[in-house]
């Protein structure tokens, strides 16, 4: 997400016409497993169950994703095949909170920034892709943050 945010900023500031942004995770199995084991974040059952009542931790995996980004006007003018647009992007952290005990405050700051930049309300969005690591505390805080965002938008539930 951070790479996408930086790429968007470069495009909006006219410092670049095309940006490639993305990331990969190819953890060194021994060190990554040891680190997450020390944090007690690994699933004891070896299965990640995001947003589930039986979630007990995460499972380390590998992945990669990259995006070619242009300003919409430039992509249209070039006849590019446009798969998606980024209307708003937000980034925040919990300012010193424990890695395994996230707080809603930082998550809400990021979501509010993205919605504000896009000029949208939460009910304008059809799909939310959650972080959802499968850690009971992290997933619960993420759901709490989303609930609060919608409550602000629609009033008490």
Locations of the language-model features?
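Condensing-enzyme catalytic core of the thiolase-fold
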Residues: 1-157
């Amino acid at each position: 997400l951070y790479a996408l945010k930086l790429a968007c900023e470069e495009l909006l500031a006219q410092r670049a016409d095309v940006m490639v942004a993305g990331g990969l995770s190819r953890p060194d199995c021994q060190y990554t497993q040891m680190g997450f084991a020390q944090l007690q974040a690994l699933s004891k059952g070896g299965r990640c169950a995001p947003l589930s009542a039986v979630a007990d931790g995460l499972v380390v995996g590998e992945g990669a994703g990259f995006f070619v980004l242009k300003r919409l006007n430039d992509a249209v003018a070039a006849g590019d095949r446009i798969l998606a647009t980024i209307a708003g992007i937000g980034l925040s952290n919990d300012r010193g909170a424990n890695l395994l005990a996230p707080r809603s405050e930082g998550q809400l700051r990021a979501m509010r920034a993205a919605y504000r930049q896009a000029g949208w309300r939460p009910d304008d969005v059809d799909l939310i892709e959650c972080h959802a690591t499968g850690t009971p505390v992290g997933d619960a805080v993420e759901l709490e943050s989303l609930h609060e965002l919608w409550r602000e938008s629609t009033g008490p539930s």
